[in-house]
Curated annotation (Swiss-Prot):
Keywords: Acetylation, Cytoplasm, Developmental protein, Differentiation, Nucleus, Phosphoprotein, Transcription, Transcription regulation. Residues 235-248 have a biased composition (Acidic residues). Belongs to the TAF8 family. Residues 14-24 have a biased composition (Polar residues). The modification N-acetylalanine is found at A2. One of its GO terms (cellular component) is nucleus. The TFIID basal transcription factor complex plays a major role in the initiation of RNA polymerase II (Pol II)-dependent transcription. TFIID recognizes and binds promoters with or without a TATA box via its subunit TBP, a TATA-box-binding protein, and promotes assembly of the pre-initiation complex (PIC). The TFIID complex consists of TBP and TBP-associated factors (TAFs), including TAF1, TAF2, TAF3, TAF4, TAF5, TAF6, TAF7, TAF8, TAF9, TAF10, TAF11, TAF12 and TAF13. The TFIID complex structure can be divided into 3 modules TFIID-A, TFIID-B, and TFIID-C. Low level of expression throughout the brain with slightly higher expression in the hippocampus. It is found in: Nucleus; Cytoplasm. This is Transcription initiation factor TFIID subunit 8. The modification Phosphothreonine is found at T128. The gene is Taf8.
Length: 308
Protein backbone atom coordinates (compact mmCIF):
# COMPACT_ATOMS: atom_id res chain seq x y z
CA UNK A 1 0.00 0.00 0.00
CA UNK A 2 1.15 3.52 -0.64
CA UNK A 3 0.02 6.48 1.42
CA UNK A 4 -2.67 5.72 3.94
CA UNK A 5 -5.77 7.83 4.41
CA UNK A 6 -6.25 9.73 7.61
CA UNK A 7 -8.62 8.67 10.35
CA UNK A 8 -11.98 10.19 11.06
CA UNK A 9 -10.51 13.25 12.69
CA UNK A 10 -7.63 13.75 10.24
CA UNK A 11 -7.20 14.83 6.67
CA UNK A 12 -5.77 13.30 3.54
CA UNK A 13 -3.21 16.04 2.80
CA UNK A 14 0.40 16.02 3.85
CA UNK A 15 1.31 17.97 6.98
CA UNK A 16 4.07 19.86 5.20
CA UNK A 17 1.90 21.16 2.33
CA UNK A 18 1.74 24.91 1.75
CA UNK A 19 -1.46 26.77 2.47
CA UNK A 20 -2.70 29.61 0.30
CA UNK A 21 -3.38 33.05 1.71
CA UNK A 22 -6.25 33.80 -0.68
CA UNK A 23 -9.65 33.56 1.13
CA UNK A 24 -11.27 31.77 -1.83
CA UNK A 25 -8.48 29.21 -2.00
CA UNK A 26 -8.66 28.67 1.75
CA UNK A 27 -12.42 28.07 1.51
CA UNK A 28 -12.05 25.45 -1.23
CA UNK A 29 -9.19 23.80 0.65
CA UNK A 30 -11.23 23.58 3.86
CA UNK A 31 -14.21 22.14 1.97
CA UNK A 32 -11.96 19.56 0.31
CA UNK A 33 -10.51 18.50 3.66
CA UNK A 34 -13.99 18.10 5.13
CA UNK A 35 -15.00 15.81 2.27
CA UNK A 36 -11.85 13.78 2.76
CA UNK A 37 -12.68 13.35 6.45
CA UNK A 38 -16.18 12.12 5.48
CA UNK A 39 -14.74 9.64 2.98
CA UNK A 40 -12.26 8.38 5.58
CA UNK A 41 -15.08 7.89 8.09
CA UNK A 42 -17.18 5.96 5.55
CA UNK A 43 -14.22 3.72 4.73
CA UNK A 44 -13.60 3.07 8.43
CA UNK A 45 -17.28 2.15 8.93
CA UNK A 46 -17.02 -0.24 5.96
CA UNK A 47 -14.11 -2.08 7.62
CA UNK A 48 -11.13 -0.65 5.74
CA UNK A 49 -7.98 0.02 7.76
CA UNK A 50 -5.97 1.83 5.09
CA UNK A 51 -6.40 3.18 1.56
CA UNK A 52 -4.27 4.63 -1.16
CA UNK A 53 -4.25 8.34 -1.71
CA UNK A 54 -5.48 8.04 -5.29
CA UNK A 55 -8.53 6.03 -4.23
CA UNK A 56 -9.36 8.52 -1.47
CA UNK A 57 -9.11 11.39 -3.94
CA UNK A 58 -11.37 9.56 -6.39
CA UNK A 59 -14.02 8.89 -3.75
CA UNK A 60 -13.79 12.51 -2.58
CA UNK A 61 -14.35 13.75 -6.14
CA UNK A 62 -17.36 11.43 -6.55
CA UNK A 63 -18.89 12.63 -3.28
CA UNK A 64 -18.36 16.25 -4.25
CA UNK A 65 -19.97 15.72 -7.65
CA UNK A 66 -22.95 13.92 -6.07
CA UNK A 67 -23.59 16.73 -3.57
CA UNK A 68 -23.15 19.41 -6.26
CA UNK A 69 -25.68 17.68 -8.50
CA UNK A 70 -28.23 17.51 -5.65
CA UNK A 71 -27.84 21.23 -5.03
CA UNK A 72 -28.07 22.17 -8.72
CA UNK A 73 -31.22 20.08 -9.29
CA UNK A 74 -32.88 21.37 -6.10
CA UNK A 75 -32.24 24.96 -7.20
CA UNK A 76 -33.68 24.33 -10.66
CA UNK A 77 -36.86 22.84 -9.17
CA UNK A 78 -37.09 25.80 -6.80
CA UNK A 79 -36.80 28.37 -9.58
CA UNK A 80 -39.27 26.39 -11.69
CA UNK A 81 -41.92 26.99 -9.02
CA UNK A 82 -41.09 30.75 -8.82
CA UNK A 83 -39.18 30.57 -5.56
CA UNK A 84 -35.71 31.82 -4.61
CA UNK A 85 -34.77 29.43 -1.81
CA UNK A 86 -35.04 25.60 -2.10
CA UNK A 87 -37.03 23.64 0.48
CA UNK A 88 -37.06 20.02 1.71
CA UNK A 89 -39.57 19.01 -0.95
CA UNK A 90 -37.19 20.16 -3.70
CA UNK A 91 -34.40 17.99 -2.26
CA UNK A 92 -36.74 14.96 -1.97
CA UNK A 93 -37.81 15.32 -5.60
CA UNK A 94 -34.15 15.59 -6.61
CA UNK A 95 -33.19 12.39 -4.75
CA UNK A 96 -36.15 10.55 -6.29
CA UNK A 97 -35.18 11.70 -9.77
CA UNK A 98 -31.59 10.55 -9.14
CA UNK A 99 -32.86 7.04 -8.19
CA UNK A 100 -32.26 7.26 -4.45
CA UNK A 101 -34.68 5.57 -2.01
CA UNK A 102 -35.71 8.28 0.40
CA UNK A 103 -37.35 5.85 2.84
CA UNK A 104 -33.98 4.36 3.83
CA UNK A 105 -32.60 7.71 5.08
CA UNK A 106 -34.08 7.55 8.65
CA UNK A 107 -32.72 4.03 9.24
CA UNK A 108 -29.29 5.02 7.87
CA UNK A 109 -29.17 8.08 10.13
CA UNK A 110 -29.94 5.96 13.22
CA UNK A 111 -27.31 3.26 12.61
CA UNK A 112 -25.31 2.19 15.65
CA UNK A 113 -21.77 2.12 14.23
CA UNK A 114 -21.91 5.58 12.74
CA UNK A 115 -19.05 8.00 13.49
CA UNK A 116 -19.60 11.58 14.61
CA UNK A 117 -17.54 14.14 12.74
CA UNK A 118 -16.76 17.33 14.60
CA UNK A 119 -17.42 20.57 12.82
CA UNK A 120 -14.34 22.43 11.60
CA UNK A 121 -13.35 25.49 13.62
CA UNK A 122 -14.80 28.70 12.28
CA UNK A 123 -12.46 31.64 12.16
CA UNK A 124 -14.13 35.00 12.17
CA UNK A 125 -12.80 37.46 9.66
CA UNK A 126 -11.18 40.54 11.19
CA UNK A 127 -13.51 43.48 11.13
CA UNK A 128 -11.95 46.46 9.42
CA UNK A 129 -12.66 49.60 11.47
CA UNK A 130 -14.39 52.38 9.64
CA UNK A 131 -12.43 55.52 9.07
CA UNK A 132 -15.29 57.87 9.90
CA UNK A 133 -18.10 57.11 12.33
CA UNK A 134 -20.64 59.73 13.23
CA UNK A 135 -23.92 58.83 14.90
CA UNK A 136 -25.79 55.54 14.53
CA UNK A 137 -27.05 53.82 11.40
CA UNK A 138 -30.74 54.29 10.71
CA UNK A 139 -32.88 51.11 10.56
CA UNK A 140 -35.31 50.47 7.74
CA UNK A 141 -38.84 51.81 8.19
CA UNK A 142 -41.66 49.22 8.23
CA UNK A 143 -42.61 49.84 4.60
CA UNK A 144 -39.09 48.98 3.29
CA UNK A 145 -38.27 45.25 2.90
CA UNK A 146 -35.37 43.89 4.92
CA UNK A 147 -33.46 42.65 1.85
CA UNK A 148 -32.97 46.22 0.66
CA UNK A 149 -29.50 47.71 1.24
CA UNK A 150 -28.87 49.59 4.44
CA UNK A 151 -28.70 53.34 4.72
CA UNK A 152 -25.26 54.84 4.23
CA UNK A 153 -23.17 55.92 7.16
CA UNK A 154 -24.37 59.13 8.82
CA UNK A 155 -21.08 60.92 8.15
CA UNK A 156 -21.87 60.89 4.42
CA UNK A 157 -24.85 63.22 4.76
CA UNK A 158 -24.48 64.82 8.23
CA UNK A 159 -22.64 68.12 8.44
CA UNK A 160 -19.39 67.55 10.31
CA UNK A 161 -17.23 70.70 10.52
CA UNK A 162 -13.52 69.93 10.52
CA UNK A 163 -12.20 73.28 11.81
CA UNK A 164 -11.43 73.89 15.45
CA UNK A 165 -12.79 76.71 17.51
CA UNK A 166 -10.20 79.34 18.43
CA UNK A 167 -8.80 79.03 21.93
CA UNK A 168 -9.72 82.01 24.12
CA UNK A 169 -8.24 80.89 27.44
CA UNK A 170 -5.69 83.42 28.72
CA UNK A 171 -3.40 80.84 30.30
CA UNK A 172 -3.26 78.70 27.17
CA UNK A 173 -2.56 81.73 24.98
CA UNK A 174 0.28 82.88 27.24
CA UNK A 175 1.83 79.42 27.30
CA UNK A 176 1.57 79.16 23.52
CA UNK A 177 3.14 82.59 23.02
CA UNK A 178 5.97 81.74 25.44
CA UNK A 179 6.69 78.44 23.69
CA UNK A 180 6.70 80.13 20.28
CA UNK A 181 9.06 82.82 21.54
CA UNK A 182 11.39 80.21 23.03
CA UNK A 183 11.40 78.24 19.78
CA UNK A 184 12.19 81.36 17.75
CA UNK A 185 15.06 82.28 20.07
CA UNK A 186 16.52 78.79 19.87
CA UNK A 187 16.25 78.72 16.09
CA UNK A 188 17.91 82.14 15.79
CA UNK A 189 20.69 81.14 18.18
CA UNK A 190 21.39 77.97 16.22
CA UNK A 191 21.40 79.89 12.95
CA UNK A 192 23.84 82.47 14.30
CA UNK A 193 26.03 79.72 15.73
CA UNK A 194 26.16 77.90 12.38
CA UNK A 195 26.79 80.97 10.21
CA UNK A 196 29.10 83.02 12.46
CA UNK A 197 31.99 82.62 14.82
CA UNK A 198 31.33 80.50 17.90
CA UNK A 199 32.95 79.63 21.17
CA UNK A 200 32.65 76.30 22.99
CA UNK A 201 32.47 75.52 26.68
CA UNK A 202 34.44 72.30 26.23
CA UNK A 203 37.87 72.08 24.65
CA UNK A 204 37.55 68.48 23.51
CA UNK A 205 34.16 68.70 21.79
CA UNK A 206 33.70 71.95 19.91
CA UNK A 207 30.23 71.10 18.57
CA UNK A 208 28.67 70.71 22.04
CA UNK A 209 26.90 73.81 23.41
CA UNK A 210 28.19 76.36 20.85
CA UNK A 211 28.11 79.97 22.02
CA UNK A 212 28.04 83.06 19.83
CA UNK A 213 31.43 84.77 19.94
CA UNK A 214 31.48 88.16 21.71
CA UNK A 215 32.50 91.07 19.46
CA UNK A 216 33.64 94.52 20.72
CA UNK A 217 31.20 97.24 19.75
CA UNK A 218 32.11 100.86 18.93
CA UNK A 219 31.03 103.80 21.11
CA UNK A 220 27.35 104.36 20.30
CA UNK A 221 27.45 108.18 20.67
CA UNK A 222 30.59 108.69 18.56
CA UNK A 223 28.62 109.08 15.33
CA UNK A 224 26.59 111.91 16.86
CA UNK A 225 29.75 113.88 17.75
CA UNK A 226 31.50 113.59 14.39
CA UNK A 227 30.33 115.99 11.65
CA UNK A 228 28.60 114.56 8.68
CA UNK A 229 29.71 114.93 5.05
CA UNK A 230 27.03 117.55 4.35
CA UNK A 231 28.19 119.80 7.19
CA UNK A 232 31.82 119.59 6.04
CA UNK A 233 30.80 120.54 2.49
CA UNK A 234 28.80 123.56 3.75
CA UNK A 235 31.76 124.76 5.84
CA UNK A 236 34.07 124.57 2.82
CA UNK A 237 31.62 126.57 0.69
CA UNK A 238 31.30 129.36 3.29
CA UNK A 239 35.10 129.64 3.64
CA UNK A 240 35.58 129.96 -0.12
CA UNK A 241 32.86 132.65 -0.41
CA UNK A 242 34.43 134.71 2.39
CA UNK A 243 37.84 134.59 0.74
CA UNK A 244 36.37 135.80 -2.57
CA UNK A 245 34.61 138.76 -0.89
CA UNK A 246 37.80 139.74 0.91
CA UNK A 247 39.83 139.81 -2.33
CA UNK A 248 37.12 141.91 -4.05
CA UNK A 249 37.17 144.56 -1.31
CA UNK A 250 40.96 144.82 -1.43
CA UNK A 251 40.96 145.29 -5.19
CA UNK A 252 38.33 148.04 -4.97
CA UNK A 253 40.31 149.91 -2.34
CA UNK A 254 43.47 149.87 -4.43
CA UNK A 255 41.60 151.07 -7.52
CA UNK A 256 40.06 154.00 -5.66
CA UNK A 257 43.41 155.07 -4.20
CA UNK A 258 45.07 155.21 -7.66
CA UNK A 259 42.23 157.27 -9.17
CA UNK A 260 42.34 159.92 -6.43
CA UNK A 261 46.16 160.42 -6.38
CA UNK A 262 45.95 163.75 -8.25
CA UNK A 263 43.22 165.24 -6.09
CA UNK A 264 43.64 167.99 -3.62
CA UNK A 265 45.18 167.53 -0.20
CA UNK A 266 41.84 167.67 1.49
CA UNK A 267 40.54 164.97 -0.74
CA UNK A 268 43.74 162.98 -0.12
CA UNK A 269 43.27 163.24 3.61
CA UNK A 270 39.66 162.15 3.23
CA UNK A 271 40.76 159.23 1.09
CA UNK A 272 43.36 158.25 3.66
CA UNK A 273 40.72 158.34 6.34
CA UNK A 274 38.36 156.28 4.18
CA UNK A 275 41.13 153.79 3.39
CA UNK A 276 41.95 153.48 7.05
CA UNK A 277 38.26 152.93 7.82
CA UNK A 278 37.99 150.37 5.06
CA UNK A 279 41.10 148.60 6.39
CA UNK A 280 39.63 148.47 9.86
CA UNK A 281 36.36 147.18 8.44
CA UNK A 282 38.22 144.54 6.47
CA UNK A 283 39.97 143.49 9.65
CA UNK A 284 36.64 143.19 11.37
CA UNK A 285 35.18 141.25 8.46
CA UNK A 286 38.09 138.84 8.55
CA UNK A 287 37.46 138.26 12.22
CA UNK A 288 33.66 137.71 11.88
CA UNK A 289 32.82 134.45 10.08
CA UNK A 290 29.04 134.80 10.04
CA UNK A 291 27.93 136.90 7.03
CA UNK A 292 24.74 137.93 8.81
CA UNK A 293 26.71 139.62 11.62
CA UNK A 294 28.97 141.75 9.38
CA UNK A 295 28.35 145.51 9.20
CA UNK A 296 26.57 146.99 6.23
CA UNK A 297 28.78 148.34 3.43
CA UNK A 298 27.89 151.83 2.26
CA UNK A 299 28.43 152.78 -1.38
CA UNK A 300 31.44 155.05 -1.98
CA UNK A 301 30.83 158.47 -3.62
CA UNK A 302 33.36 159.70 -6.12
CA UNK A 303 33.95 163.44 -6.28
CA UNK A 304 34.34 165.22 -9.57
CA UNK A 305 37.55 167.10 -10.24
CA UNK A 306 37.12 170.91 -10.22
CA UNK A 307 38.54 172.99 -13.07
CA UNK A 308 41.17 175.45 -11.87
Amino acid sequence: MADTAAGPGGSGTRPGSKQSTNPADNYHLARRRTLQVVVSSLLTEAGFESAEKASVETLTEMLQSYISEIGRSAKSYCEHTARTQPTLSDIVVTLVEMGFNVDTLPAYAKRSQRMVITAPPVTNQPVTPKALTAGQNRPHPPHIPSHFPEFPDPHTYIKTPTYREPVSDYQILREKAASQRRDVERALTRFMAKTGETQSLFKDDVSTFPLIAARPFTIPYLTALLPSELEIQQMEETDSSEQEEQTDTENNALHISTDDSGAEKESASVLQQSSSLSGSRNGEESVIDNPYLRPVKKPKIRRKKSLS
